[in-house]
A protein has these predicted regions:
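Patatin-like phospholipase
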Residues: 1-38, 46-328
Length: 328
């Protein structure tokens, strides 16, 4: 059977997607149409888009050398202050880009640009979410590439944009990886492009239409309470300024996506990730295996319930309207 897939962000916790995809294939969904993702989810969506299957996905994540991705420089973590001052990131970000490029080049259906990918699989095969901090907007690659220009002032061609560059932007966790720059066509100023999770860690709505041809399954990672339970952050005591700042950041990044998870619950596979942190680059093999098992078990339980892929097109606008203040 065929389905579209959308994968949320989660840093190194994205290893759980490999297990979830194994159970998805066992449920009969072994062909993908359109794919989208943010951050770690962008890497997963990209790999599926260029032909890696469920078994291949496990190998993909096993090739990810987490220590190498944290490329501080020849002197290691001593170089962090210099990296931050010069490039606004703790690491150089080059190792992650090169790993992505290698995945694309060695894929069953290798592709360098979005145009090459769509020529083989059709339009909207892959959508990758990034954030332009300077212009305060979500950027969906390749759809929004035309918003930017090259050094000669010519608008960028979505079909010629490199997949690896888009995924590197989407996975560029702020401060840890340096942001990327693209010149905005309207303002003439450089955009500051970072992790798509800043605006939407779970863009499950990207492929929604009034009459979908097949279901869109969403894959979302969570730690702590399940997403259907209300979260709570204690903001009190001597550390309240830090607690409040963290709560502001978490709310700005996740409030809409938590709402979307409820709106799109019938087609969301929620995967617990235990106590693993998004930027924990020192995972043991036991932790990696545990993440895989979390994903496999969560997806197996989801499909055991015989989900129908309920079409929730328009659910968010309707719910937002209903939740408005009286008279709106």
């Amino acid at each position: 059977m065929k389905a579209d897939g959308v994968f949320a962000g989660g840093g190194v916790k994205g290893l759980a997607f490999a297990g979830a995809l194994e159970s998805t294939a066992k449920a009969g969904y072994d062909e993908w149409g359109k794919l989208a993702g943010t951050s770690a989810g962008a890497i997963t969506a990209m790999a599926l888009a260029v032909g890696y299957d469920a078994a291949g996905m496990k190998e993909v994540f096993e090739t990810l050398d987490l220590d190498a991705i944290a490329d501080y420089g020849p002197l290691g973590e001593v170089e962090i202050p210099v990296n931050l001052a010069e490039d606004h990131g703790m690491t150089r970000g080059q190792a992650l880009l090169e790993w992505i490029e290698k995945l694309l080049a060695s894929a069953p259906a290798p592709a360098e640009t979005f145009g090459e990918l769509e020529a083989r699989f059709g339009p909207e095969r892959l959508q990758v979410v990034g954030t332009d901090l300077a212009h305060t907007r979500m950027v969906v690659f390749p759809r929004d590439v035309h918003l930017y220009v090259d050094e000669h002032g010519h608008r960028l061609d979505p079909g010629e944009f490199r997949i690896a560059d888009a995924v590197r932007i989407s996975a560029g966790f702020p401060y840890f990886f340096p942001p990327r720059s693209l010149r905005d066509a309207e303002t003439g100023k450089d955009g500051v492009l970072v992790d798509g999770g800043v605006v939407s860690a779970y863009p499950v709505f990207l492929f929604d239409t009034a009459e979908p041809r097949h279901p869109t399954w969403g894959y979302r990672l969570y730690s702590g309470n399940p997403p259907e339970k209300p979260p709570y952050t204690e903001i009190d005591g001597i550390a309240w300024p830090v607690d409040m700042l963290k709560a502001i950041v978490d709310t700005s990044m996740n409030a809409f996506d938590k709402f979307a998870t409820l709106a799109f619950g019938p087609r969301t596979i929620s995967i617990p990730t235990g106590d693993v942190e998004s930027l924990d680059f020192s995972l043991s093999q036991e932790q990696k295996d545990e993440l895989f098992d979390f994903g496999r078990d969560a997806a197996a339980g989801f499909f055991a319930g015989e989900p129908t892929g309920v079409n929730t097109f328009g659910a968010i606008p309707t719910a937002v309207s209903a939740a408005g203040s009286p008279g709106n």
